[in-house]
UniProtKB/Swiss-Prot annotation:
It comes from the Bacteria. The active site is at residues 111, 131. It comes from Salmonella typhimurium (strain LT2 / SGSC1412 / ATCC 700720). This is Carnitinyl-CoA dehydratase. Keywords: Lyase. Belongs to the enoyl-CoA hydratase/isomerase family.
Length: 261
C-alpha cells in the first residue's frame, strides 16, 4: 500500500486517509493505491462502510497532481482500477462510502467526494471544478454527477468558471449531508457510519443497486424493473434471514443481529 494512504479498520468501518502534503493531490501511483483500497473494501465481507478523508486541515484533495502533469503525466493516463482517485468509476460498489471533507475539495478532489454516497464536511471546506481554467474538463465524474445535484445555471457557472462553493452553500443545495466544525468532522463521519452499520447490509446493497438501475427511469417503469427479477440483491432481501430478523427484533424490543443473508 502507498505511504500516501493510511488505512484504519474500526470493526466493520474502514477509514482511508489521503496524506500527500501539501495539498493531498493525486497522481497515477496514488490513484492506483486508492483503487486497490476501495476494491479490497468492496470485496471484504467483514467491512460495511468506508470513510475517505484527507490529512491535515486545509485540503481534502486538490485533485490531479499538476506537478505530475507538468512532468508528463497525461490527463488520460491510466489511473488504475476504479478510475481517478480509485472510486470515481467503481460502479458495482454496494457498500456506502462517506467523504469526510476536511478542507478544499477541488477538481478531482471534488469528484472523489461526489462519488461517495454521503458528504460530511468541515465549516472551512469549499468545493470547485476549475478544470476549464487549466484547459481540461472534469471528466472523472464532475461533469456527470454534479448536474444530478444542482440546477443547470449553477452547474454551468461552476464548471465553466471554476467558481467555488462554500460548505454552507453546498448544504443549502443538498450537495453535502452535514457541516460541522473541523474538530467534530471525524466524530460526525463515524457517527453516520455507525448508523449505516445498524442497518441491514443486504438492504443497503439492494438500495444502492436499485438507485443505479432506476435513477433515469419513470417511476412506473422503475416498479416493473425492480420486480422483473433481473436485480441481484432486491430478490435476495425479500427472502433473507435478515428480513425475518428485523421484524422479530422489533417485536422483541431488541437490536437486530444482521447476518447479511
Amino acid at each position: 500500500m502507498s505511504e500516501s494512504l493510511h488505512l484504519t479498520r474500526n470493526g466493520p468501518i474502514l477509514e482511508i486517509t489521503l496524506d500527500r502534503p501539501k495539498a493531498n493531490a493525486i497522481d497515477a501511483k496514488t490513484s492506483f493505491a486508492m483503487g486497490e483500497a476501495f476494491l479490497n473494501f468492496r470485496d471484504d465481507p467483514e467491512l460495511r462502510v468506508a470513510i475517505i478523508t484527507g490529512g491535515g486541515e486545509k485540503f481534502f484533495s486538490a485533485g490531479w497532481d499538476l506537478k505530475a502533469a507538468a512532468e508528463g503525466e497525461a490527463p488520460d493516463a491510466d489511473f488504475g482500477p476504479g478510475g481517478f482517485a480509485g472510486l470515481t468509476e467503481i460502479f458495482d460498489l454496494d457498500k456506502p462510502v462517506i467523504a469526510a471533507v476536511n478542507g478544499y475539495a477541488f477538481g478531482g478532489g471534488f469528484e472523489l467526494a461526489l462519488a461517495a454516497d454521503f458528504i460530511v464536511c468541515a465549516e472551512n471546506a469549499s468545493f470547485a471544478l476549475p478544470e476549464a481554467k487549466l484547459g481540461i474538463v472534469p471528466d472523472s465524474g464532475g461533469v456527470l454527477r454534479l448536474p444530478k445535484l444542482l440546477p443547470p445555471a449553477i452547474v454551468n457557472e461552476m464548471v465553466m468558471t471554476g467558481r467555488r462553493m462554500s460548505a454552507e452553500e453546498a448544504l443549502r443545495w443538498g450537495v453535502v449531508n452535514r457541516v460541522v466544525s473541523q474538530s467534530e468532522l471525524m466524530e460526525s463521519a463515524r457517527e453516520l457510519a455507525q448508523q449505516l452499520v445498524n442497518s441491514a447490509p443486504l438492504a443497503i446493497a439492494a438500495l444502492k443497486e436499485i438507485y443505479r438501475a432506476t435513477s433515469e427511469m419513470p417511476v412506473e417503469e422503475g416498479y416493473r424493473y425492480i420486480r422483473s427479477g433481473v436485480l441481484k440483491h432486491y430478490p435476495s432481501v425479500l427472502h433473507s434471514e435478515d428480513a425475518l430478523e428485523g421484524p422479530q427484533a422489533f417485536a422483541e424490543k431488541r437490536d437486530p443481529v444482521w447476518k447479511g443473508r
